[in-house]
Amino acid sequence: LVLVPTNGKFGERVAHICEQFCNVKHIKYDWGRSFDLYELEQQLERGCYEALLICHNETSTGITQDAAAIAEICERYNVSFILDGITSVGGMPVHPLEWNAEAVVMGAQKCTAGPSGIAAVAINQNFVERVETIRKQGDTNPLYYFDMIPALKKGDDDQTPWTPAINLVMGWSAALEGLQEETNEARWNRCAHMAKGVR
């Protein structure tokens, strides 16, 4: 069972995607309203949740979730913390190790300024072990192209299981080089300045 609180369009999309593959408890907050952390903690205390998944930066309503506080709650109840960081990675501080996030999903086309059509998932060892355990139990979800096990095995050799979209990979690589030259802090400050300008 996965707990997915939402307060905007993209969080709701995340919840809908999760519903295709697992059991979900979807808590819908009013769009633009921050999550009630006390309510989330009560849910985790009462339920048998394996994970809590959030859309970190909800661009449809301009709300950034307090990922550090949510991560702390997840750790308290031994629940995996998963982050949709598509519009936060590259544009604001994201600390997967500090937050003990099991997975962070990111898209090239947002704050890393890469081409659309390519994404990445940063995962920790616990996530890998969980995937392997679920696979051994005979998981029936369709996953051929998105199977992380062959991707991880090939990744050890700097390869991919199938032909990647080379033009997108090279485009994102160039964008990441630009981010490295600009520095994370300068990019975060630039994004914050632009956000303030349009509010």
Task: State each model region's role.
Residues L97-Q109:
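Conserved active-site segment immediately N-terminal to the catalytic lysine
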Residues T112-G197:
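Active-site C-terminal subdomain of aminotransferase-like
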Residues F35-G90, A103:
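Active-site phosphate-binding strand-loop segment of PLP-dependent enzymes
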Residues P5, L53-H56, M106-G107, A122:
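Short beta-strand segments
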Residues V89-W99:
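Glycine-rich, charge-decorated loop segments at or immediately adjacent to ligand/cofactor-binding or catalytic sites
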Residues L1-C48:
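PLP-dependent aminotransferase-like
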Residues F10-E12, R33, S88-G90, K110-G114, ...:
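Short gly/pro/ser/thr-enriched loop/turn and capping motifs at secondary-structure boundaries
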